[in-house]
Amino acid sequence: MYKEKYENWLNSKIINEEIKGELRNIKDEKEIEDRFYKDLEFGTGGLRGVIGAGSNRMNIYTVSKATQGFANYLNENFNNPSVAIAYDSRNMSKEFSKAAALTLSASGVKVYLFESLRPTPVLSFSVRYLNCQGGIVVTASHNPKQYNGYKVYDEFGGQVTDDKADKIISAANEIENFEEIKTISEGEAIEKGLLVYIGEEIDKEYTEKVKALTIRKELVEKNAKELKIIYTPIHGSGNIPVRRVLAELGYENVKVVKEQEAPDGNFPTTNYPNPESPQVFELALEMAKEEAADVIFGTDPDCDRIGVLVNEGEGKYRILTGNQTGLLLTNYILSSLKETGSLPDNGVVIKTIVTTEGARKIAEDYNVEIMDVLTGFKYIGEKIQQFNTTGDKKYLFGFEESYGYLAGDFVRDKDAVIAAMLIAEMTLYYKAKGISLYEALIKLYEKYGFFKEDLVSIELAGKEGSEKITACIDCLRKTTLTDVDGIKVLTKLDYKLRIEEDMINSAKKEIDLPPSNVLKFILEDGSYFVVRPSGTEPKMKVYLAVRGNSLENADSEIERFKDKVMSIINSKL
């Protein structure tokens, strides 16, 4: 089947010579198979893949095909639909966004296209602000430079959830050849009012909304200039919006890492533009030590995720995990709302099923409900929309362990601009009390327990890798796991079958979440591990968590637990 697809591409009158030339130069049969054995699929992050020729690659044809499916879906479900499109600093992002825009315009869908790169959360905001029926961001988030991607948003500004994604993919799969993809020239699209370039008006509205999320306004007005911040946009789209928000709030002491300031899809200072990686902060650390900075921020290329390093004193800085930053923000937001008399009775904090249980302890302390959703911020965005529709709950904060955070409800995806603003305010608050952000974290641990999490990613690329991941999880699903190193398994949660099983009493109940190929095992000491395929990369992810009685104890416990769990996982691979 892949051979036939390969030949179809070579013989197509639509495919350009550059793409055909790339295909002809492939001498490895396995490489041809990998490029054509499937079409790119929607995962937790939408469409994502290596840039290149082939049906399983990101190129203007696969982008246009997906977009034609999206256009057909929109025209079937809405009258006179419109779509907002943004893109990040990656190679081919601008070209892919233009290809998508022209396919939509040719299909009669009005397009609002940003005239230059913008963060993903700004796109989410613009969908709502412009009353669009959909949105597209061309980005591969934090993936290596050879990747690009394409995230689709619904009329509420959130990433499309499973039902809508399935309909869009189904519509795209009905397109059997590239001749069915509509196109139009840019000039004609503009002339017909089907393509409108946007920019500053949206930026201004968005910036005002972000600034309005400040909780302790007097503190910020009085002391913002005292906080020393080092910021790196890691060659991405965050540079202008993050610095603009901070500057307008009075944070005068923000210095950017010059070598990582300019947008650049080759990411020349790093192999992996991921704020989870300590390596991306090496240049920022040098600056921070010279400036005695209070905090370091780094945002990924599409500026929806943020990494944080905090000053420990004596010229040392500690990188916070996504879970640690989430705990600090959960506590800061809830305590500040309570102190200022703004904490609602029906408030909710939302986290994903692989995110720290420490947040539950904090929320319970403030009588705030905490809600678990599947991995992927789109499920948090979906809940915000449900709350706004029913009016029975008030969204306060949401986060996931992979460095994504959101306060406010005018954006429906994780937002590193909002997070940077809140983390700056939080750092300022603790500084005024004479303690660092790290000391504040230790106080939380002392109060609620020393939670420690870890993540093991097992890379298994290509068709064979994908099959191995599926087989491993299926094998684990069928295995009756009673204990890990002598510690009993209390609960097994199978999110694919949507069954929560009490392993002690053999009782079962339904999980009220959409089906997803995820397994979670909770042990009697409160530790747990989760296994799932990555939705955006050729990896299997194993999440681990323990709760210790000290930092040292938690560190040793997570290592012991990881060894035992990975021996179980590896035996299934």
Describe the predicted segments one by one.
Residues 115-176, 274-298, 327-333, 348-359, ...:
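Phosphate/diphosphate-binding loops
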Residues 36-56, 140-141, 233-245, 301, ...:
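Conserved phosphate/anionic-ligand binding catalytic regions in large, soluble enzymes, centered on
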Residues 31-36, 40, 148-280, 288:
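Gly/Ser/Thr-enriched, mixed-charge loops and adjacent short helices
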Residues 82-88, 228-231, 406, 545:
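Short glycine-rich or small-residue beta-strand-to-loop segments that form or flank ligand, phosphate
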Residues 96-104, 147-154, 304-324, 359-362:
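Short Gly/Thr/Asp-enriched flexible loops that form oxyanion-binding sites at enzyme active sites
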Residues 84-147, 248, 252-308:
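N-terminal small/polar loop signature for handling phosphorylated ligands or for N-terminal nucleophile
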Residues 2-100, 107, 189, 195-225, ...:
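An N-terminal, well-structured beta->alpha segment
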Residues 293-295, 316-318, 336-532, 539-541, ...:
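Phosphate-binding and adjacent anionic-ligand microenvironments
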